[in-house]
């Protein structure tokens, strides 16, 4: 991107927190004064102290992007996580389901008039599950450098030239790559790693496609293919070295009642003595 875009993004990211962020409880206020009047030290809220779901989405995603793409100011990740914590704590209705349209500054739901509803012309699933989807992508692929699996069920002949594009979002060029593909639970190798395009085979029925996208240069990944009767079946990819072994251990520790493992090493490149001994 142009350097001017980066500069402007940083200007906005640095200006918003002192003006519109609740630095005590997390989250972003609905409406704030844009300027300070003579003698004022703090930006004033307009009409009320409510926090709307839309501002939380924009704030959370913006700061995850800034943290993941530039990684030059630790406060960007802090603002993203504080906003996430407030949203998860107060905007989700854990009893009846759904997302509140508005809450007060302290998190109490604001349920008056048209804002008591959880869906409207300006609030839909696009705004709620999009936040979950993109926040997971940015935090995993860009911030914490964790691989992610995505699932598709394309109809036969439903895509031009049978090309299935699986990039989850517009991410910085070269930051992620398509590492592995499975079709109907079987490894599949006809795909473009950097372009993240799967060349689908001819079929007369919908295909079950699973892809693993990971940060570029990750070096190793362990993917759980199935877990039945205490046996976990994993597909390993890359180089299993002493430094990468904790990644494999982490995946194993997620399973309760594990009694044995079966390992698919088709995509393994190397494994050192530490890996073999483990």
Predicted feature residues:
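Short glycine/serine/threonine-biased micro-segments
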Residues: 24, 236, 273
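Short beta-strand/loop segment at the start of cytosolic alpha/beta domains
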Residues: 218-235
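Secondary-structure boundary/capping motif
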Residues: 207, 235, 269-270
